[in-house]
């Protein structure tokens, strides 16, 4: 049995074992809850104050939120409170440029890049990102928009790619000051709705484990997983994908980083080949805008480090609006 197929079985087993625990509101071993926001009720409002080790998650936690009156407002208020509590129970790192973070988030993210290769340059708008939101205290969904690809060559056809989806189930986490670490199961997928030139033509599943560990201002975030076309595909083949990001919180709003992004091809047209990219980058944020809404930015350049590569360079720009 090949490596990627074994990995798919392993990912399914991990999700089966962890699912009952994922849906609980408590976090960590021993069933003890991680620190949460302390809420003080007043006649006209509710004020949430962060506990020690929760600072920096959202400046808006120190602000006063009007008490909801209608049914929809109460549901929205409870959902936002769940998001604040969930983020308080995990590290407060910024998401890397290319590596998927194991943190659970509520944010709108838009990525764009320009890559160059033997066939010329290509612009991508969307980058497989979109709206990320919580559906349970330890479960997050992402619904993306099909990315739009625009070649730079005169006369070349542009078009939309497939619809990206993602589920995150947090298995373990500790906030800063209490371990600063996490482990998350990720299941990505693409729905074949794109143009034939830029879509895969088949659904693709991408199971992975995301990990992270911080020490002071330094943290390491990474993922290891695969890309598995449903029903097999002689063109795409199976892929083993590994990403690791080393990040440093240099100043209040600056997060320089360096990533290693590797893909090992099994079957398909690139069977037996591998490609590795080094990705220096810089993150900026989070800047409080209003209420729970914040702004963060990131940019980086992937540089091919192996003889075989499907493209030479990729300059990436990422806009995030956490809420």
Regions found by a protein language model. Give the residues of each.
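N-terminal targeting leaders only when they are immediately followed by extended low-complexity/repeat-rich tracts
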Residues: 4, 13, 28-31
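Bacterial N-terminal signal peptides that target proteins for export
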Residues: 1-9
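Transmembrane beta-barrel domains of Gram-negative outer membranes and organellar outer membranes
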Residues: 26-323
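Bacterial N-terminal signal peptides
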Residues: 9-18
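Sec/Tat signal peptide C-region and signal peptidase I cleavage site
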Residues: 19-25
